[in-house]
């Protein structure tokens, strides 16, 4: 009887040992998609919200399953009911019937402050203001415009408006620094990216700043969508930016620079001052002058191979970012288009990790609840699909090449080099003589519907490389 019972228990334990990993680690995550262009994230009461252009918004409890709340500017939109009357001055000034990228923050009074903006589109004629609500889902009531651009004559800083030097007043992001001061970074193309110190009680800029302090850009260089996130572990402020054009052929890509102070100066991984980054005088959209600068986290790519359908993005950009103080995890939230789908776009979230040089690297696949855990060498070795994001601003979609990470720590295949696991999950990789560092991470591949080993690494030139086994 005892022997029979022992055999039954042993067999049950053996079955569990072989089946449990599949149920735990290969369970298919559930995603629900939404479309919010230029998503700016805020967390409140355990729920994540994103607000974007055209008064679009969505919410999620887990950053994976999203619920669309609003989609377009109309008088029926519950965020700002009767919006064309409520923001009449804004629409009239901008000569527009829509709104651009919004940002929402909560101030000490518990109220939610929505920074809205409208732009004519073919010129930097724009207006920016703030509306306030007791509930994050609205209704928001207008408190007024505080910045205008694109005017003929005197600008907000008291000098004649010059579109090569002065900002286009769109794409705001408000944030608190580590000392509790409130700031707003903003700007798109035209004269560049600027920052203002804000009144934390009123939500308006402190007086006497004009357009504020310039951080980078100018001469109509294609830089926009600024977003600042402080990381208490590295004690740096990270300024995220989008370079290029937002459409499927515009070469949109996500970059980052950092500073020890919220208002700069900001530098890239090579130590270049971002204040000097701009197009040449007398030019429009001079991408060649700006593309060497800033750490490029991702651009257009596909993990597609010869024998299987892959996954990829086209013109990912206009991101926000979130740091979870409880877990210490960071996330990159952005919109993206997709190969073969034209101008359709959806929100995506990728986890961020800091490499040993204090720069963020983005997980190759979308966030599916994964955590950074210890990995073993035997799980790392094998054949990988490799993406090199480079530094260019281009409509080209980066394609994969194949490499092998061998047991003897060499790399062979279409590129050669070396690799080493330097900690529980940290990666040192050399490819074609360039040194990269970052992380090894097991992630969910939604095309093959299984967990795979990946790596995300960055070199000192600010070039990101991803691998997927």
Curated annotation (Swiss-Prot):
Cofactor note (record): Binds 1 Ca(2+) ion per subunit.
Activity response to pH changes: Optimum pH is 7.
CDD domains cross-referenced by the UniProt entry: GH43_GsAbnA-like
Gene Ontology terms describing biological process: arabinan catabolic process
Stored Pfam families: GH43_C, Glyco_hydro_43
Record site feature (Important for catalytic activity, responsible for pKa modulation of the active site Glu and correct orientation of both the proton donor and substrate), residues: 171
Cofactor: Ca(2+)
Gene3D superfamilies associated with the record: 2.40.128.10, Glycosyl hydrolase domain, family 43
Active-site residues (renumbered): 38, 224
Pathway: Glycan metabolism; L-arabinan degradation
Enzyme Commission number(s): 3.2.1.99
Residues spanning the signal sequence: 1-26
Keyword DNA-binding appears in the UniProt entry: no
UniProt site (Important for substrate recognition): 318
Alphabetically ordered keywords of this record: Calcium, Carbohydrate metabolism, Glycosidase, Hydrolase, Metal-binding, Secreted, Signal
Effect of deleting the gene: No visible phenotype. Double mutant abn2/abnA induce an almost complete loss of this activity.
Effect of residue 318 to Q: Loss of arabinanase activity
Enzyme class: hydrolase
Binding site for substrate: 38, 122, 168-171, 188-190, 220-224
Domain of life: Bacteria
Family of the protein in this entry: Belongs to the glycosyl hydrolase 43 family.
Protein name: Extracellular endo-alpha-(1->5)-L-arabinanase 2
Species in which this protein is naturally found: Bacillus subtilis (strain 168)
């Amino acid at each position: 009887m005892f022997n029979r019972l022992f055999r039954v228990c042993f067999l049950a334990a053996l079955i569990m040992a072989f089946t449990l990993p599949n149920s735990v680690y290969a369970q298919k995550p559930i995603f629900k998609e939404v479309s919010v262009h230029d998503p700016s994230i805020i967390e409140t009461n355990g729920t994540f919200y994103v607000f974007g252009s055209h008064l679009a918004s969505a919410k999620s409890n887990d950053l994976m399953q999203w619920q669309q709340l609003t989609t377009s500017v109309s008088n029926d939109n519950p965020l700002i009911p009767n919006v064309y009357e409520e923001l009449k001055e804004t629409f009239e000034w901008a000569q527009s019937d829509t709104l651009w990228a919004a940002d929402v923050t909560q101030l000490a009074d518990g109220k939610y402050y929505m920074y809205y903006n409208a732009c004519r589109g073919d010129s930097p004629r724009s207006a920016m203001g703030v509306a306030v609500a007791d509930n994050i889902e609205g209704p928001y009531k207008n408190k007024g415009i505080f910045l205008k651009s694109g005017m003929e004559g005197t600008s907000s800083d008291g000098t004649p408006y010059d579109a090569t030097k002065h900002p286009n007043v769109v794409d705001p992001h408000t944030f608190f620094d580590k000392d509790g001061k409130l700031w707003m970074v903003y700007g798109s193309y035209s004269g560049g990216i600027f920052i203002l110190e804000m009144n934390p009680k009123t939500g308006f800029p402190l007086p006497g700043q004009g357009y504020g302090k310039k951080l980078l850009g100018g001469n109509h260089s294609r830089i926009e969508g600024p977003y600042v996130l402080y990381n208490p572990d590295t004690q740096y402020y990270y300024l995220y930016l989008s370079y290029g054009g937002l459409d499927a052929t515009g070469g949109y890509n996500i970059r980052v620079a950092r500073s020890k102070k919220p208002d700069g100066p900001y530098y890239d991984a090579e130590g270049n001052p971002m204040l000097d980054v701009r197009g040449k005088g007398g030019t429009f959209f001079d991408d060649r002058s700006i593309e060497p600068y800033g750490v490029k986290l991702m651009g257009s790519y596909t993990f597609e191979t010869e024998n299987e359908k892959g996954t990829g993005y086209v013109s990912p950009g206009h991101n926000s970012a979130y740091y979870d103080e409880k877990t210490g995890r960071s996330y990159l939230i952005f919109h993206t288009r997709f190969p073969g789908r034209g101008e359709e776009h959806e929100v995506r979230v990728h986890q961020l990790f800091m490499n040993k040089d204090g720069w963020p690297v983005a997980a190759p696949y979308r966030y599916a609840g994964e955590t950074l855990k210890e990995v073993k060498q035997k799980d790392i070795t094998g054949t990988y699909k490799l993406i090199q994001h480079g530094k260019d601003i281009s409509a080209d979609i980066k394609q994969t090449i194949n490499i092998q990470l061998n047991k003897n720590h060499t790399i062979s295949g279409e590129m050669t080099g070396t690799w080493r696991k330097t900690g529980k999950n940290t990666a040192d990789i050399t490819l074609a003589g360039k040194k990269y560092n970052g992380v090894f991470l097991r992630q969910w591949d939604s095309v093959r519907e299984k967990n795979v080993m990946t790596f995300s690494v960055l070199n000192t030139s600010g070039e990101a490389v991803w691998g997927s086994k």
